[in-house]
Amino acid sequence: MTEPSAATTSLVSDFNIKKILELLPHRYPMLLVDRVLEMEPRKRIKAIKNVTFNEPFFNGHFPGHPVMPGVLMLEALAQTAALLTFGESNHKRQENQLYLFVSIDGARFKRQVTPGDQLVLNAELLRSKSGMWKFKVFATVDDEVAAEAEIMCAVREDKSKGDA
């Protein structure tokens, strides 16, 4: 992915955890994005997940050798992509909307992620149409790729809202 010029990159110092909680329905233990560092609306986003030993998945993955599950790296990347989708003023997530995984292609896990690592999450919008969004995503630790994939997500109505 090419780096945009400083003039086109939006440095989002106010895009902290409060803003993330406004845009994503995820909560502990499934909220996997801590802060957005950069966002270029409708193009790309860069965020972070600080990985600590206190993550609940480290209890069993693996005792004595804690490693962040690859599927959770992909989930963190999907949440980052959702922030790019809903971080625009003209496409805010409504209370009755869900952001769902539709597909994952070419997923590769290239580096173990362990407690103390800072996972840098990147998503680039490839295309969007009719509530479907396709992204190239990758996560790095210390500038080394840990995971990469192409993902497709969809915005759909949450039909469970209002059901008892």
UniProtKB/Swiss-Prot annotation:
UniProt cross-references to InterPro entries, sorted A to Z: FabA_FabZ (IPR013114), FabZ (IPR010084), HotDog_dom_sf (IPR029069)
The keyword Ligase appears for this protein: no
GO biological process: fatty acid biosynthetic process; lipid A biosynthetic process
Keyword flag Lipid biosynthesis: yes
Top-rank taxon: Bacteria
Catalysed conversion reaction: a (3R)-hydroxyacyl-[ACP] = a (2E)-enoyl-[ACP] + H2O
EC number(s) recorded for this UniProt protein: 4.2.1.59
UniProt GO MF annotations: (3R)-hydroxyacyl-[acyl-carrier-protein] dehydratase activity
Localisation: Cytoplasm
Cellular compartments per GO CC: cytoplasm; membrane
EC category name: lyase
Residues forming the catalytic site: H61
Keyword terms: Cytoplasm, Lipid A biosynthesis, Lipid biosynthesis, Lipid metabolism, Lyase
Principal subcellular localisation of the protein: cytoplasm
UniProt-listed Gene3D superfamilies: Hotdog Thioesterase
Pfam families: FabA
Family matches, as NCBIfam families: fabZ, PRK00006.1
Similarity annotation: Belongs to the thioester dehydratase family. FabZ subfamily.
Function: Involved in unsaturated fatty acids biosynthesis. Catalyzes the dehydration of short chain beta-hydroxyacyl-ACPs and long chain saturated and unsaturated beta-hydroxyacyl-ACPs.
Protein name: 3-hydroxyacyl-[acyl-carrier-protein] dehydratase FabZ
The organism of origin for this protein: Ralstonia nicotianae (strain ATCC BAA-1114 / GMI1000)
Lineage: Bacteria, Pseudomonadati, Pseudomonadota, Betaproteobacteria, Burkholderiales
